C-alpha cells in the first residue's frame, strides 16, 4: 500500500534482490517508465549497478526535449476494473490490445492464454493507478539526474519521428554523449520492441554484456 514513488519502488527492488540472494552489481534492463527508476537507482547506489540496457526507456528530460508536460493520470475508480471483471472482459473481447505484437507462432497458445489471465487479474490494479498518478512527481524528483559518465549504457529505440524533426534517436544521443561506453540500437517498430525484435536485441545484448567483462 506504499505510495509508488521512485524512492519506494527502488528500495523495494533492492530489498527483493537482497531477499532472493541475488548479488550485485546488477545490469538493469528498464523498459518504458522504469527508465526513471533505473536512473534513480544508478545515481543513488552506483556501486550496485554494473550497466543499464534500456528498451525505449522513459527519462525525465523527455518532457522538456519534446515539449510535452502533460502527464497521464487515472481516476481512483479504475483500480476496480480487475476485481469486478471488466479487465477480464477486455482481455477476451479486444485481445489485440493486450497481447504481444508478434509474428504468428512466436508465442504458444499456452503463452497467450497465460497473458490473458495475467491481464484479467492485474490490469490497471490499485498499484498501477497509484504509479500512474505519481509519474509527474517522479519526473520532478529525477529531472536533474543523468547517467553517470562511467556507467555503461545501451539503449534500444524505435525509429520514430516527432514534430519539428525531433526524434527519440536524437534525444537518446544527447543522453549518451557524455558516457564513455555507450551504444544506441535503432529498430523499426513500436514501444514494445522486445515483442518483435527479441532475436536482434538478444544478439546486441550479449555482445554488449560480453564487452563488460
What positions do the PLM features span?
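Short aromatic-enriched loop/helix-cap "lid" or pocket-rim segments at secondary-structure transitions
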Residues: 1, 63-69, 73, 167-168, ...
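Short, hydrophobic alpha-helix immediately C-terminal to the catalytic nucleophile
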Residues: 14, 39-43, 202-206
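Conserved hydrolase catalytic core segment
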Residues: 24-66
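A catalytic-pocket lid/entrance helix-loop region that shapes and gates access to the active site
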Residues: 58-90
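Conserved serine/cysteine hydrolase catalytic core
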Residues: 108-178
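Catalytic histidine-centered segment of alpha/beta-hydrolase-like enzymes
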Residues: 184-199
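Post-His helix in hydrolase/transferase enzymes
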Residues: 195-209
Amino acid at each position: 500500500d506504499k505510495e509508488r514513488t521512485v524512492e519506494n519502488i527502488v528500495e523495494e527492488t533492492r530489498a527483493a534482490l537482497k531477499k532472493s540472494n541475488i548479488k550485485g552489481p546488477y545490469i538493469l534492463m528498464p523498459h518504458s517508465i522504469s527508465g526513471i527508476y533505473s536512473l534513480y537507482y544508478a545515481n543513488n547506489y552506483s556501486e550496485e549497478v554494473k550497466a543499464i540496457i534500456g528498451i525505449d526507456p522513459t527519462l525525465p528530460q523527455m518532457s522538456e526535449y519534446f515539449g510535452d508536460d502533460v502527464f497521464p493520470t487515472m481516476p481512483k475508480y479504475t483500480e476496480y476494473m480487475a476485481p469486478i471483471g471488466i479487465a477480464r472482459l477486455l482481455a477476451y473481447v479486444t485481445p489485440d490490445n493486450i497481447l504481444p505484437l508478434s509474428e504468428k507462432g512466436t508465442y504458444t497458445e499456452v503463452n497467450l492464454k497465460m497473458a490473458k489471465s495475467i491481464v484479467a487479474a492485474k490490469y490497471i490494479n490499485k498499484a498501477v493507478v497509484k504509479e500512474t498518478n505519481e509519474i509527474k512527481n517522479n519526473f520532478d524528483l529525477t529531472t536533474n539526474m543523468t547517467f553517470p559518465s562511467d556507467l555503461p549504457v545501451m539503449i534500444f529505440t524505435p525509429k520514430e519521428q516527432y514534430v519539428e524533426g525531433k526524434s527519440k534517436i536524437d534525444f537518446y544521443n544527447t543522453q549518451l554523449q557524455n558516457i564513455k561506453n555507450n551504444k544506441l540500437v535503432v529498430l523499426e517498430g513500436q514501444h514494445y520492441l522486445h515483442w518483435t525484435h527479441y532475436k536482434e536485441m538478444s544478439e546486441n545484448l550479449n555482445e554488449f554484456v560480453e564487452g563488460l567483462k
